[in-house]
Amino acid sequence: MATAGSSYSVSTDHQVSSPLVNLGNVAGVCIMSNAWKVEQEPSLINFISAFLSANSFRLNFVSIPPDLIFNCGGVSIAFVFVTKWDFSNVASIFSRVKRLKGQFAQLYVVATLSTKEQSDSFMRSYFQYEMEFGKPAFVQVTDAEMGFEKIVKIAHSRGVCKQQKVASKLKVERKRTVQDTNIFIRFVTSIPNINKHDANTLYQAIGSIEAIAKASKEDILANTDLSSKKADTLTRFFQDPEFYLSPKFN
């Protein structure tokens, strides 16, 4: 469903990667949705099969709600894998993600966004369908092969963490990330005329406060949906002393 009408073209410069570093004795199983499989080109399925084999994962085909489920190191992680961003199918992608979020405690969405138009469409849709930041986590990639490699690395890392009993450390890191995000949003929304939506957009598209401070007006306009006036306000706030040192009264 998430990849209805999807297509896949073989990249001539992609080869099956060598096994993951420090995989050790972690046994992994990849369960692939039958419905998702039939929507993909055989070349992609062949790449996936070879990559999993190289990294000591078994591959099973089963009728499951998400596109992929990885069982690794005692942890089950579900994935929605959008191999082609279909502009006409955006609503069903996000409604499916919301439904699966309630069914799987650990869910990731990996989306192939190979053009600026696709990336812009994703950003607009992310806010239009009121997704909660980080729930689930979205991972953007430029091609399907890269996307699957990231999926395996995510599953592998979660399995290793489970085996090493570092779940408490992950919880602390997650809390710290949320705190850092909240600090970022509070700081950016303190800038005149910049609201929470703008702050979230800047966080997704540009990143840190330092990166925004260095960004030009053109960079902000090219990577976000902010207006020209707001982009000008941001660049002046960070780069024009007369602007950021002057008092702001309504």
From Swiss-Prot:
Keywords: DNA recombination, Endonuclease, Hydrolase, Meiosis, Nuclease, Nucleus. Its EC number is 3.1.-.-. It is found in: Nucleus. GO terms for cellular component: chromosome; nucleus. One of its GO terms (biological process) is reciprocal meiotic recombination. It comes from the Eukaryota. Disruption phenotype: Reduction in the number of class I crossovers (COs) during meiosis. Delay in the formation of synaptonemal complexes (SC) as well as a few unsynapsed axial elements in early pachytene nuclei in some meiocytes. Early nodules (ENs) are observed on the central element of SC. Reduced fertility due to altered male and female meiosis. Expressed in roots, stems, leaves, siliques, flowers, inflorescence and anthers. Strongly expressed in meiocytes. GO terms for molecular function: endonuclease activity. Its main location: nucleus. It holds the Pfam family HHH_5. Belongs to the ERCC1/RAD10/SWI10 family. Required for chromosome segregation during meiosis. During diakinesis and prometaphase I, essential for the formation of class I meiotic crossovers and homologous recombination. PANTHER family: PROTEIN PARTING DANCERS. Interacts with SHOC1. This is Protein PARTING DANCERS. It comes from Arabidopsis thaliana. The gene is PTD.
